[in-house]
Amino acid sequence: MGFITVGHENSTSIDLYYEDHGSGDPVVLLAGWPLDSRSWEPQLHALLEAGHRVIAYDRRGFGKSSRPAQGYGFDTLATDLGKVLTELDLRDATLVGFSLGTGEAARYVGLHGTERLKACVFIESLAPSFVKSDENPNGVDEAGVADVQRAILHDRFAWLTELLGNFLNLDEYLGKRVSEETVRAAWNAGAAASPIATWACVRGWLDDFSDDLKRVDVSTLILHGTSDRILSIDGQGRRLHAALPHARYVEIEGGPHVMCVTHAAEVNRELLAFLREPARAVATA
């Protein structure tokens, strides 16, 4: 456990908290918004038992990392990721992104290439684009982003409760695939995040990662749940597979947005199988 300094704001440094466990080829876990690295608990033990070195860090504004008032665009977040890889001198790394973390992974490749990477994993992907269009009617537009940001400013804690209901499909899975205690832990993590960071990251939903994906030339796995109410499988997972047709693509039946929790066994099985025998992926032009 430690901190990596990625910048400064006025008189204080911007430090990212990270944990580094195990040995072997590194697996870097990129959490979803508005959660932090603790959300990977269902995957951590499985990865370590399989013999991987696992690095999980809290992006700026979340978890135990610094909470600056700026720097929440994907270019900055991807640059932070690059500094983590460089500071720890990680090579042959596999980036495992969930939700917002997939945007960081894609933008990192777009900015820095794949020299340090062995593979990429996109779970419930924000890429290729979450912008509403004829091709993606379930996406968001400027008005949708503004609505979410207003809800966060009005009552962030009530908004978070509603968000987690849709993250985990609680009307279907509470008491079956997810406990009240797990929901409470996720709520506490989201509530503890910087309100500025929580609000600011929403703007990133309007980013287009199509050009970034063109630089993906390493082994790639795409995992998407068929019941994701946030990033629909038609609008996101299947479109990402169209952009990366040589990726290993797996749909998890009934998986909600945070299927790493509700369908942990299925996610872990596919993730570990991919890490054992990765399938090469090359983006389409």
What are these regions (language model features)?
Residues 106-154:
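Flexible "cap/lid" loop of the alpha/beta hydrolase fold
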Residues 31-33, 93, 97-102:
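Conserved alpha/beta-hydrolase "nucleophile elbow" surrounding the catalytic nucleophile
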Residues 131-139, 151-214:
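Conserved alpha/beta-hydrolase catalytic His-Asp/Glu region
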Residues 9-70, 84, 230:
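Conserved HGGG/HGGXW glycine-rich cap/lid loop of the alpha/beta-hydrolase fold
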Residues 76-93:
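Conserved acidic catalytic loop of the alpha/beta-hydrolase fold
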Residues 245-285:
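Catalytic active-site module of serine/aspartate enzymes centered on a nucleophile-bearing elbow/loop
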Residues 58, 94, 119-121:
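Residue in the alpha/beta-hydrolase core beta-strand immediately N-terminal to the catalytic nucleophile
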Residues 215-255, 266:
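Conserved loop-alpha-helix segment in the C-terminal half of the alpha/beta-hydrolase fold
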